[in-house]
Amino acid sequence: MNNLVLIRHGQSKFNLQRRFTGFYDVELTTKGEEEAKEAGRLIKKLNIEFDFYFTSQLMRAKNSLNIILKVLNKENVKINNAWELNERHYGGLTGLNKDETIKKYGDKQVKIWRRSFDIPPPLMESNHPYKNKIDSNILGESLKDTFERVMPYFNKKIK
């Protein structure tokens, strides 16, 4: 029987500022780096071995994995980076503070954008301040869109 271990990246600068992140590439905070080290220590303590390593192409995920691998003394393993594993694209919400967004649009609407399966957030427009900093033709995703992006990669490469 095979096991799949999923690890979320450590705290990022946007997490700390309570901003929607999605495809925007932000660095880990010092706390995020420590969280990744702690994940590595726990994996080591539990004596978990991996055959394959996968990560999104986002810096916060890649750096978290690299920190974990350093703790495990496995820095020379092959890492499979794939944009298909990137976090959900938050579209026009990218970079906005979550609390301010709730004040502006209301808690109910923000929950719809965040939690409904098939309703995406507002799409990222061409004049969005982060548009030129994100290398993607995707302008925003519902959870369904994200699922449909991730699952073909998962079924072909990971499963």
Task: Name each model feature, range by range.
Residues 17-19, 113-136:
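Short, basic/glycine-rich phosphate-binding loops at helix/coil junctions
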Residues 39-125:
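Phosphate-coordination/substrate-recognition cap region in phosphate-metabolizing enzymes
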Residues 8:
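Active-site beta-alpha turn of Rossmann-fold NAD(P)-dependent dehydrogenases/reductases
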Residues 106, 151-152:
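Disordered, low-complexity tails and leader-like regions
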Residues 102-110, 130-144:
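A short, terminal or domain-edge coil/loop segment
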